Amino acid sequence: MKILVVCGHGLGSSFMVEMNVQEALKQLQAPASIEVAHSDIMTASPEMADVFICGRDLEENAQRLGEVIVLDNILDKTELQEKLEAKLKSMNQL
């Protein structure tokens, strides 16, 4: 399984959220086989990952990708972990 964090340019904010996703996966004791990466929203495509994560500002553009976790606040680690846990449970990954 692969998770792709996307932002406008694929640099700072998506990289920061990627690191937070990795931390959340450890805390959730998720399978080590789950991969996490980051990219810009424009080059992201549905076949690049099973789950995509983005901020609320990119929600409309990200809908074309498939399974998307939308964060109201990309700095909120609690929100990220709660939404990630719910998504992974719904996909039988936890």
Protein language model regions, located:
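Short, polar loop motifs at secondary-structure junctions
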Residues: 39-41, 53-60
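Structural signal for conserved beta-strand scaffold positions within catalytic alpha/beta enzyme cores
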Residues: 5, 38, 54, 69-72
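Short loop/helix-cap segments at secondary-structure boundaries that form the rim of catalytic
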Residues: 44-48, 58-67
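Short acidic active-site motifs
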Residues: 39-44, 79
